[in-house]
Amino acid sequence: MKLTSHEEYGLRCLIRVAQQGPGGKLTIPEISSAEGISDAYAGKLMRMLRLSGFVVATRGTGGYALARPANEIVLSEVMALLGGRLFEGDFCATHPGQLKACVRLPDCSARVLWRAVQAAVDDVLKRTTLQDLLFDEQQMMVHLKHLRESAAPARWQ
């Protein structure tokens, strides 16, 4: 499993805008230069983020700003826009190989594992905001430790 470039760069662009603080703006060239991507790709990602209500654009040389405070932007919403889930519940039924149905469909330990992994990822993303991603690495580790310690075991099943 790995993140797509849309997920990685889209999130990085959104973090970059959030780093400007309330009301702060960045233009496409500023975003693309800071993130090492083309203007066209930054523009495509920012358009997606704008159409989904994460950022607002000011025409001309105004640039992009957050549409709402960073502490109100939940990562599960952002990641759903940029790429979706790592493991979809119907994966086994839709990927049987050359057979009509996966031979392990009735009893599959791997499916249980992937569902638990997805539940853990979902839990972290639902309880993490864009504001949390403005932490430095050490602060983020503390945040994640807190999430892990406060997670109910049933959440990850």
Question: What feature does the model see in each segment?
Answer:
Residues 52-67:
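Beta-hairpin "wing" of winged helix-turn-helix
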Residues 10-22:
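Short amphipathic alpha-helical interface segments
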Residues 46-47:
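Short, hydrophobic-biased segments on the C-terminal half of alpha helices
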Residues 33, 50-51:
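Alpha-helical residues within the helix-turn-helix
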Residues 94-157:
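C-terminal regulatory/oligomerization modules of transcriptional regulators
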Residues 26-36:
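A short alpha-helical element within helix-turn-helix/winged-helix DNA-binding domains
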